[in-house]
Amino acid sequence: MQVGSKWVAFFSQTGSEIVSLIKKGYRPDLIITDNKESYDERKTFFKYFNIEFWYRPLPKSINYKVQYYDEILNSKDIVTLHGWLNIVPADTCERYTIYNGHPGHIVNYPELKG
């Protein structure tokens, strides 16, 4: 990881992949979910490992979606998406180093599958 960067992981579903990574010794600096049920279920686990964990719903407007990521991330951060069921705006993809562990919202956008 780059000096001065942090690992930020996003998930929309259960967070089981992040939990598995943590159990194997990998520690994101910050985890964000837009799923309130998963937040409530996982917050004790992440707190035990001293990992910052935020529930942060995503706004509907594309303009606010770019702002959403900009308020969370710094230019040197490494971002991983783990079942993040949101399309990340192109501007955001260009600004940050993002790795998508799973395809996007393939239920509503099957053309993204692959």
Residue locations for each model-derived region?
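One-carbon transfer enzymes
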Residues: 1-114
